[in-house]
Amino acid sequence: MADLVDHSPHHATKAAKLASASNVILIDNYDSFTWNIYQYLVLEGATVTVYRNDEVTVEDLVAKKPTQLVISPGPGHPDTDAGISNAVIKHFSGKVPIFGVCMGQQCMITSFGGKVDVTGEILHGKTSELKHDSKGVYQGLPTSLEVTRYHSLAGTHSTIPDCLEVTSRVELGDASGKNIIMGVRHKEFAVEGVQFHPESILTQYGRKMFRNFLELTAGTWDNKQGAAVAAPADKKLSILDKIYAHRKNAVDEQKKIPALRPEALQAAYDLNIAPPQLSFPDRLRQSDYPLSLMAEIKRASPSKGIISANVCAPAQAREYAKAGASVISVLTEPEWFKGTIDDLRAVRQSLEGLPNRPAVLRKEFVFEEYQILEARLAGADTVLLIVKMLDIELLTRLYHYSRSLGMEPLVEVNTPEEMKIAVDLGSEVIGVNNRDLTSFEVDLGTTSRLMDQVPESTIVCALSGISGPQDVEAYKKEGVKAILVGEALMRAPDTSAFVAQLLGGSNQNFAGASPSSPLVKICGTRTEEGALAAIQAGADLIGIIMVQGRSRLVPDDVALGISRVVKSTPRPADTLQQPSSATSLEWFDHSTNILRHPSRALLVGVFMNQPLSYVVSQQQKLGLDVVQLHGSEPLEWSSLIPVPVIRKFAPGDIGIARRAYHTLPLLDSGAGGSGELLEESGVKKVLDSDEGLRVILAGGLNPDNVAGTVKKLGQSGQKVVGLDVSSGVETNGAQDLEKIRAFVKSAKSIRQ
């Protein structure tokens, strides 16, 4: 850093009175720098009146007819400590020019829907190098200059609303390449702010910045003032053009990162590590509703600004799947829609293990193969291709490349000419965007008008602008097969209820089908007689111990005899209403059904910290229907064992709710057979940690306490889908047949 230079106007020449700044009002947020701002404004010829933020009303200011407004710095947070500043910005935006300094800028960001947060450092008089866009208050200034900062808060990049643009930045200074927002400007209104202090003696060209502001006379930029010098070029570009140009630059930069080079992505794909995919058209044809739902995860949009900035994409995806969505659309454009490819990757992971998961669509402005390959590696089943932004040659190339990766694209059209292109291309799925991407106007009749151009075999999806059942009725009659809904779903307080209302049906179709009574597992079985008694009593699972050194270890010859009894003895079957094949049933609801054989009990072999090869060989030798891992075996073993796997967890263990590995988790206190009851609060905490979790409960259960133990868990007890007993049905170390019968009866009576 160079020596500090005093840029203050020690012997400043006062400018002549500015007729355009004859009634400037300065809102004082109780900050000492307000005097310095007043000084600079007056030196530039303004006539200024100062009001503290709690001593004047908006109505008072309206009556005073200000020519310009300035919002001063101040201590605290813009949401709680700025008095009427936010109300002033909201009322006068578009009417008169407004300039905000430090907290004044933060008020502008929050007033238009953004957020401010801590920057990670508290600055008091620090000088930094500023980079700016040479428009607005920066007109006529060098592109790099020294400014002074007094702040700990600043606007956050991810929440800057679409109506504002970032005009200046300083580097974070940690070699990360990240920067802190130092200036914002409204794209339409003459509203501009700076995070630094132009009135500080260490800021270069501070007076010039105030002069540039004072020369503004209108409330908008459309009269060729200030920032509008460069605005006409932007005005000629549609939002689609802007996004395309921005994404092109961003993707070009991304491909320079060594790990993200096209060659690196191709090498990863060649290793066959992309998540398994499904057929997008086939999944669209499966729905319990009259139309298939493409449910969109949408944090923001150019037309609506911030919709739900803090949404957890994978959690939202599970909600959509539970509500019956056939497709989940994930917006991965970061600037206007606030999404990333990481959202898609997390969404795909969250759907792992669903028996009939929704397809995953990458909703992005795709213009090269790199983006399609990136999508497939992240887990996409399909990508969006927008006819309006691609020439026919490029569209054709991208379409066939996507199909070469097993992904039938969603081809988006808006006009009859674009529909003809999509049909000639051979598109199996065509989306009609009811929103014109050049004007962003919505016309829900667009889809209907284009239907007569489409072959009967083509799936047509209506995109954009759908908010309620009234928007859907006509589509049902006209042959539309699917609708895409984003904003309305994101704002719905109850996703499943909204979907049922929107598409006409009952969200009860999508509730997990649960047995009327829990599974019962009689463990530690050592005789054919014990197995037979348990089965005849109605037990679902017969457990035999395969752990060397344990008192309940069953020799192979005895185990084979028990196996024959289990497989030849019928038992009364519970009736379970199977869900529709189109339903995305939760993993643990599905796997509970797997452990409920329609006509007999299942034989479970219990192992603990034994080699995988031994576990597999014993499973094959003894004909085990299920394997139980009761030690610290890797989670991945569940996918390497050729039968369903029950895995033991203690409260607090990591991985209990991981889908697509263990069939069900068994919640137990120790090594098994200890007779120790689990602490009620610990069990509740585990069960309440994940809405979709289901468990087999073990540890200290017996015929007398099993019903009460589950009842004490309250509503959480509904997630207990199985009960495991060993020592609780023994007398003097041997299985007691009467206790077995009593336990099964008591356990089965819990939910009838």
Curated annotation (Swiss-Prot):
Active site: C102 (nucleophile), H197 (for gatase activity), E199 (for gatase activity)
SUPFAM superfamilies linked: Class I glutamine amidotransferase-like (SSF52317), Ribulose-phoshate binding barrel (SSF51366)
Keywords: Amino-acid biosynthesis, Aromatic amino acid biosynthesis, Decarboxylase, Glutamine amidotransferase, Isomerase, Lyase, Multifunctional enzyme, Tryptophan biosynthesis
One GO location term (cellular component): cytosol
UniProt-listed Pfam families: GATase, IGPS, PRAI
Chain positions covered by the region annotation N-(5'-phosphoribosyl)anthranilate isomerase: 519-752
Domain of life: Eukaryota
InterPro entries: Aldolase_TIM, Anth_synth/Amidotransfase, Anthranilate_synth_II, Class_I_gatase-like, GATASE, Indole-3-glycerol_P_synth_dom, Indole-3-GlycerolPSynthase_CS, PRAI_dom
Pathway of action: Amino-acid biosynthesis; L-tryptophan biosynthesis; L-tryptophan from chorismate: step 1/5; Amino-acid biosynthesis; L-tryptophan biosynthesis; L-tryptophan from chorismate: step 3/5; Amino-acid biosynthesis; L-tryptophan biosynthesis; L-tryptophan from chorismate: step 4/5
Example of a GO biological process term: L-tryptophan biosynthetic process
Reaction(s) the record says it catalyses: N-(5-phospho-beta-D-ribosyl)anthranilate = 1-(2-carboxyphenylamino)-1-deoxy-D-ribulose 5-phosphate; 1-(2-carboxyphenylamino)-1-deoxy-D-ribulose 5-phosphate + H(+) = (1S,2R)-1-C-(indol-3-yl)glycerol 3-phosphate + CO2 + H2O; chorismate + L-glutamine = anthranilate + pyruvate + L-glutamate + H(+)
A GO molecular-function descriptor: anthranilate synthase activity
Functional description taken from the UniProt entry: Trifunctional enzyme bearing the Gln amidotransferase (GATase) domain of anthranilate synthase, indole-glycerolphosphate synthase, and phosphoribosylanthranilate isomerase activities.
Gene3D superfamilies to which the protein is assigned, alphabetical: 3.40.50.880, Aldolase class I
EC numbers, comma separated: 4.1.3.27, 4.1.1.48, 5.3.1.24
Residues that bind L-glutamine: G74, P75, G76, Q106, S152, L153
Region (Indole-3-glycerol phosphate synthase): 239-503
Domain Glutamine amidotransferase type-1, residue spans: 23-223
Official protein name in the record: Multifunctional tryptophan biosynthesis protein
